[in-house]
Amino acid sequence: MAGLVAAARARELGAGVGLFEKGDRPGGSMLLSSGVVWRYRDFDEFRRQCPDGDEPLQRLIWERLDEALDWLEGLGVAGSPHTTNPLTTGRRFDPGSLTGALVRAAGEVELGRSSPDEDGPLVVATGGYPVRLAGGRGLLVRSNPWSEGEGIDLALARGAAEAPSDEFYGRAMPGPVPEEHFVAASQLYGRFARRVNDIGEEFFPAEVSWSENDLAQAIAAQAGGRAWYELGAEALTRPEVAAKLPYAQQTEPLRGGGLRVRVYAAVTHTYGGVRVDTRARAADGVWVAGVDAGGVSNGGYASGLAQALVLGLAAAEDACQ
């Protein structure tokens, strides 16, 4: 998303843009997402939820998102208010329609090519390194298959500084699923379950966060990056559970009633990356946007699409000055 946003905004400002996409289609992981672009309603809540994140970047995203959403709708794609979470506010877009609108505004996308040959001004926006992180830790991938971190490597080679983190945004999944099921198949009901590992230890007895991202990372730390959700009879009646159980791939009945469901940690995007300022500038002639920019959500969870949208705009605007 961030690369398309940056290209669209740069063209709007009169710049000539070369847009390179490593994959065989535009849209990156945005196309596989729920399409909700959101922020916390209150900035202090943002800080409470993501206490280890870069505060100036957090404030930039929080302050600019609403006008950025208006800009996005100005491209001809309609969003609907997203109000189901009392902590957050945002808009939901159809991912396919959003991708199409951004591609039309961004111009020609050269597919199958990850970077230009020349060393001119460059905006890097490649979706972080979820594939690399998942492969190194034996976890499932819940992102596009191309985000391996080469964009971050390129920015670092051109003088950028690293913003390291081993955190990620992910979900508990029932096992490998087709990418079109990444959202629907997420086993997002761990707060109603007893969470145990393969030797029966309850590894996460604490209260689970609203996003369950903390639980996904705790599952990743278990042997094999997997765990069991043990659900009692009452939990099985909850609509949040009933909607997700059809996607379960391995279940076992519990003695005395109930069910346990096998889950695996899956990585959507990483939190580490390149250090940027509030103009998305990483080095002389290099801007980094989206989740290639590290350090925004550390210690919690915030919208990766909001980060992509705001930093994509900031990168284009600064690069075009």
Label each residue range with its predicted role.
Residues 1-19, 315-316, 320:
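N-terminal Rossmann-like FAD-binding beta1-loop-alpha1 element of flavoenzymes
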Residues 20, 119-129, 286-288, 312:
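Short hydrophobic core segments
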Residues 22-107, 194-209, 243:
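Conserved N-terminal/central alpha/beta ligand/cofactor-binding core
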Residues 90-117, 150-158:
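Helical element adjacent to the flavin cofactor pocket in flavoenzyme catalytic cores
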Residues 124-175, 305, 311-314:
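Glycine-rich loop(s) and the adjacent beta-strand/alpha-helix scaffold that form part
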Residues 158-252:
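An anion/pyrophosphate-binding glycine-rich loop and adjacent beta-alpha core
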Residues 247-299:
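A glycine-rich dinucleotide-binding beta-alpha-beta segment and adjacent secondary-structure elements
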Residues 284-321:
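Catalytic phosphate/nucleotide-handling subdomain of diverse soluble enzymes
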